[in-house]
């Protein structure tokens, strides 16, 4: 993923926070030597605005590299501390949109699993409760729209997380028989060249200084979302 001008992806900015629409294909942080990541691009942007000053950018949360969506950063340590407290206490709320392949067991539901991460393969899997190293994962999903393709039924879902585990949405949905379109890790047998259809489409926070509730939304740009009418699910951008 190549970003020509990071300013094209900035949704909101003031003296305390900076909010971006992270495109799919770029890491939020530490992508490795020679690889571009969003943190580095934004630090360069801040440095150009404030010549002679060391740029500060606090990473509050991350999205997986193939996932697009809203990401908030802090522009000073005080704002970072306030936002981190919100993250720890569950006050920062994220709403995801996803496209799944195959039939659904209903129009909405709750998934509750125990997930264990494998650091060697950078994957997670559902295991039995009580498995060493496993963590409880809970999410809620709701059907928004369905479209029938030549090969399969596809569904646009709204997903809300109660917990935040490694690859949680991707693992739980695949384990429940509702794999995400384009997921090469957890739905490889049905994945062609389509990108992963997962977007953190809405983010709600309290401003770290004023306490004002703020909500940011983005319209998914991924190919798999284009078959659906997004007008009723996110504000037009």
What role is predicted for each listed range?
Residues 1-237:
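RNA pseudouridine synthases
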């Amino acid at each position: 993923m190549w970003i020509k001008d990071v300013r094209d992806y900035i949704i909101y900015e003031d003296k305390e926070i900076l909010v971006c629409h992270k495109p799919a294909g770029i890491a939020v942080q530490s992508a490795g030597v020679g690889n571009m990541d969003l943190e580095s691009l934004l630090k360069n942007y801040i440095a150009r605005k404030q010549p002679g000053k060391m740029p500060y950018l606090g990473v509050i949360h991350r999205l997986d590299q193939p996932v697009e969506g809203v990401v908030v950063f802090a522009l000073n340590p005080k704002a970072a501390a306030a936002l981190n407290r919100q993250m720890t206490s569950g006050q920062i709320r994220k709403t995801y949109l996803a496209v799944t392949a195959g039939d659904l067991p209903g129009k909405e539901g709750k998934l509750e699993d125990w997930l264990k991460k494998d650091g060697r393969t950078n994957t997670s899997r559902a295991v039995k409760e009580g498995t060493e190293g496993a963590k409880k994962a809970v999410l809620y999903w709701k059907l928004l729209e369905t479209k029938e393709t030549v090969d399969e039924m596809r569904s646009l879902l709204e997903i809300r997380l109660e917990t935040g585990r490694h690859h949680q949405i991707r693992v739980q949905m695949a384990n429940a028989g509702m794999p995400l379109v384009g997921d090469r890790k957890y739905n490889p047998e049905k994945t062609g060249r389509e990108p992963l259809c997962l977007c953190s489409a809405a983010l709600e926070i309290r401003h770290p200084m004023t306490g004002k509730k703020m909500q940011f939304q983005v319209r998914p740009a991924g190919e798999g979302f284009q078959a659906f009418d997004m007008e009723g699910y996110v504000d037009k951008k």
